[in-house]
Design a protein with these regions (language model features):
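A substrate-engagement module of RecA-like helicase motors
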Residues: 17-127, 132-135
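Hydrophobic residues on the short alpha-helix immediately C-terminal to a glycine-rich phosphate/catalytic loop
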Residues: 9-13, 38
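Amphipathic alpha-helical interaction segments
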Residues: 14-17, 166
Length: 178
């Protein structure tokens, strides 16, 4: 429905607008699932579009009890040595890279699935992710939004949720130590 109504014309306009990448931002997993469903329908038409969903680090990590550090995590150790082969597969295979597909690829290449999703974001046409990846100062995708490297379209799902999310992101809380 609504996801397709925004994604399809935006994708169709890519060759004419010089837009390099589409960001589909949602506050909720359900909104991301809706975008993934719309992308599945688009991919079923054999269009050579690459897309991915960035899953939160806490949900994607293979070793959540370990620090994200090459000294503690085997998926971080040697990450950049194994990354090129994984990215080559993403470049060579149009379609949607969801959490499960990225995890499978990450396991095969023994790389961190979360970091792989961030690096793979440069290789795809559409990125489905949480609002935080654009608006939160601590999790913003700096490689896209602070380096000012390209022209992007941003589609915001359920925009009315952004107000509450923004208040949470930019509010401070002081707690008394006991």
């Amino acid at each position: 429905g609504k996801s397709m109504a925004s994604l399809f014309p935006t994708l169709k306009s890519l060759p004419k607008t010089q837009v390099e990448k589409i960001f589909y931002l949602s506050a909720k997993t359900a909104g991301q699932a809706s975008a993934e469903d719309a992308l599945a329908q688009i991919h079923a038409q054999q269009l050579p579009i690459r897309s991915l969903t960035i899953t939160a680090k806490r949900k994607a990590c293979f070793n959540p009890e370990q620090p994200c550090d090459p000294n503690y995590c085997d998926y971080a150790k040697g990450y950049f040595d194994r990354l090129p082969q994984a990215l080559e597969i993403i470049r060579d295979q149009p379609g949607h890279w969801d959490k499960a597909r990225l995890e499978t690829l990450a396991q095969v290449h023994q790389v961190c699935p979360f970091e792989l999703s961030l690096d793979a974001a440069r290789e795809v046409d559409v990125i489905v992710c949480d609002y935080n990846y654009l608006f939160s100062p601590s999790t913003r995708l700096k490689r896209f939004f602070e380096e000012r490297r390209g022209r992007y379209s941003v589609l915001l799902d359920e925009l009315h949720n952004l107000v509450d999310r923004g208040q949470d992101m930019f509010s401070a809380e002081v707690q008394k130590l006991q």
